[in-house]
């Protein structure tokens, strides 16, 4: 007897939910097509088609500045921030578009705060659901996030610190209004964080700032729907403190 795509997806999700027992409780979704490859954004008839895309991993590195493993099948997302490519196996190998509305899971409380963009469906959900049609779309989004973070950091002017300077240090140190000699120190504001990756695991990581809100259950905050073009969409709380991409 054959197995329907819905049954296969649900089986894959059960394997995912039972195989990840970390505090984050990964929520897994497949990426349609072959990760590490790019293509123009699709029209409605192409969205979520699950077909291989034309370019290879070199395009990933050119666009995002990071290498992508050839065997990757999933991408980790945490509150709209790219975390890593995940090697296939942890969440199964799935590329079936989610064109079946009846495959939506029942809403229930869940601790999961991770999300794999793509077209199969989550078991427990996450606080942020992203609409990502293709790998190209994902790369453009990730690059935009990196540029926004860099631009936001550059707009923070360095604040000089002053400290007394002992006699004989420097020829003509600056003086304050009281005539006291001071030296100026420009602090490191952390603007030069490289984006690197392990060949198989982490590519980009999200850094939670001290002011970020503590993790919350996504009970009641997950709203997900599936359109017939295979695009998983939803909306949730995206305010989670200031987050930056770092290596």
Curated annotation (Swiss-Prot):
Residues 1-28 have a biased composition (Polar residues). Disulfide bonds: none annotated. GO terms for cellular component: cytoplasm; nucleoplasm; nucleus. May play a role in development of the periodontium which surrounds and supports the teeth by promoting the differentiation of multi-potent cells from the periodontal ligament into cementoblasts to form the cementum. Binds hydroxyapatite and may promote the biomineralization of the cementum. Also promotes cell proliferation. It is found in: Cytoplasm; Nucleus. The keyword Cytoplasm applies. Keywords: Cytoplasm, Differentiation, Nucleus. Residues 1-52, 147-183 are annotated as: Disordered. Induction: Up-regulated by hypoxia (at protein level). Phosphorylated. GO terms for biological process: biomineral tissue development; cell differentiation; cell population proliferation; odontogenesis. Expressed by cementoblasts, a subpopulation of periodontal ligament cells and cells located around vessels in periodontium (at protein level). GO terms for molecular function: hydroxyapatite binding. The gene is CEMP1. This is Cementoblastoma-derived protein 1. It comes from Homo sapiens (Human).
């Amino acid at each position: 007897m054959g197995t329907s795509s819905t049954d296969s997806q649900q089986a894959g999700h059960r394997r995912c939910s039972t195989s990840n027992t970390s505090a984050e409780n990964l929520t897994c979704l497949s990426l349609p097509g072959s990760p590490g490859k790019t293509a123009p954004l699709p029209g409605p008839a192409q969205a979520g088609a699950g077909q291989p895309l034309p370019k290879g991993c070199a395009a990933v590195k050119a666009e995002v500045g990071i290498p992508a493993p050839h065997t990757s099948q999933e991408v980790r997302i945490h509150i709209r921030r790219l975390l890593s490519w995940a090697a296939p196996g942890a969440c199964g190998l799935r590329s079936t578009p989610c064109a079946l509305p009846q495959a939506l899971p029942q809403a229930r409380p869940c601790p999961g705060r991770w999300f794999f963009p793509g077209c199969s469906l989550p078991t427990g959900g996450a606080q942020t659901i992203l609409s990502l049609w293709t790998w190209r779309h994902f790369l453009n989004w990730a690059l935009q996030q990196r540029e926004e973070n860099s631009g936001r950091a550059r707009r923070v002017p360095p604040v000089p610190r002053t400290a007394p300077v002992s006699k004989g240090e420097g020829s003509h140190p600056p003086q304050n209004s009281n005539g006291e000699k001071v030296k100026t120190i420009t602090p490191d504001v952390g603007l030069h964080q490289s984006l690197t990756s392990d060949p198989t695991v982490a590519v980009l990581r999200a850094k939670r700032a001290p002011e970020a809100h503590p993790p919350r259950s996504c009970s009641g905050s997950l709203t997900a729907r599936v359109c017939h073009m295979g695009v998983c969409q939803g909306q949730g709380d995206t305010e989670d403190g200031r987050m930056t991409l770092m290596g």
